[in-house]
Amino acid sequence: MATPLEQWVDEVARETRPKNIYWCDGSEAENQRLIQEMLASGTLGELNQQQYPGCYLHRSDPSDVARTEHLTFICSERQEEAGPTNNWMAPADARAKVGALFRGAMQGRTMYVIPYLMGPAGSPSSKIGVEITDSPYVVANMRIMTRMGEVASRQLGGSGEFVKGLHSLGDLSPERRFILHFPDTKEIWSIGSGYGGNALLGKKCFALRIASVQAREEDWLAEHMLILGIESPAGETYYVAAAFPSACGKTNLAMLVPPASQKGWKVWTIGDDIAWLRRGADGRLWAINPEAGFFGVAPGTSTKTNANAMATVRKNSIFTNTAVTEDGCPWWEGIDGEVPARLTDWRGQPWVKGSSDKAAHPNSRFTAPARQCPSISPHFDDPQGVPISAFIFGGRRARTAPLVFEAFDWDHGVFVGASVASETTAAQSGAVGVVRRDPMAMLPFCGYNMGSYFDHWLKMGTLVPRPPKIFHVNWFRQNADGKFIWPGFGENMRVLHWIIDRCEGKGAAVESPIGMLPSNGGINTEGIDVGGDTMKELLTVGRPDWKAETESIGEFFGKLGARLPDEMGRQREALVKRLG
């Protein structure tokens, strides 16, 4: 008798009518065969194999270069379950409308069946997904981003316990592009886009939108967080998980290289984007990175900003929408070295130095295996994960938020996370530079009602006897001239020191209306150009700014309606009172 997976594959094939069906095993031979086919069809271009062995370039359709949030839907039975921050479509309507687009969508194409694991093999925290796609580019990326093929098929066996992901490029028309999530049946449908976040269904679709629903049902957390380990000169390692909206330096922090001044300290990378956290027998939260690769933004990445990322992408990586140098190397704005006189831009057109157009798309990407990262943690594949000492929230704020502060307690920390805001960037299609509320950096990724999500966080605080301490950071504070006043990058290690000291019951702090701030000298500034006055400015809590902030938070909370937990309102009122 056919397994649930075989039955589903038959069902999809009857609808989409591919010319053939291929079951992926994840082997190197399969990968090489697919790459050769894509080189022949022009889906991939070969990069300089001496300098970038095993690396290739993909150029996407110019209308298909970022996540399309306005075409991303949560299809819960009741609209209230999706809540006001998500687009909602009734499941029956979604299946009828988008099902029609899938009819015959794979004619003349190969249908690939990709079984994959989210999380290390054999981990109690791991889950299985299967993506059906007509894009070999998706197969090649999923092989990097997940533990794919035989390893997942073995773990699945004949079980029906897997998240179904159906993807087709369709005709790539933005008018016929939809990314649908069915939380009640744990299914994902995506059509009309080949872009990473829309097409690699293990990533945001499963690991956050569907997994956040599973986490709520099963009492764990699925979060848009990096995970890093900080090892002291004495050999003690502390793990932190941090949530920032896009373009706030998540990947850079996850792969931080401690500067020479922080002699003896090491940073270990577990993940740069997603964390799944469960309660451990010891009363702490333990985290795994469900992914196996990095899907990072290329522009701005250099040996100065992220030396580990630059080393990671030197082999076996796929570059999407970057420019290419005359000798066949990937290039983007912000990479090391002089700007070349001539390049081929992300559209495949000749580009000359001084052109007003960007040579690489602002949201151009690299897909690279995590195991190639020089700072990858020895616990990257640990089925148990790692114990988390601190949660760090942050956003890109020019003036309001200080460099770092600590929440008073868990419930206050949930409020701090719930009121995260940042300025928009190229990773979202839409206006750039607008301040948008992005609670826990999950606004585009929470698969259910945001008010219920805050409630779930509050509940987790009661279920975890030794919860992480909660902090907020802002690397992006500016002075009156609009200049960044904190050096950032590797020097962020100094802030992490203070955070770890606070977790250890050390580290001097003073109370402020918004939380605990480092006391004078609490952050070591030896060897950097940050004087006492600058540090004072970095840690200033401007009451007029914060009063405006409480208004803005109140407006956002008001949009969440009856599902907003009363505790969030109480926390906001307490902040208003403390500000006086």
Where are these regions (language model features)?
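Conserved internal helical-beta-strand scaffold that buttresses enzyme catalytic cores
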Residues: 1-248, 258-580
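Hydrophobic positions on the alpha1 helix immediately C-terminal to the Walker A/P-loop
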Residues: 253
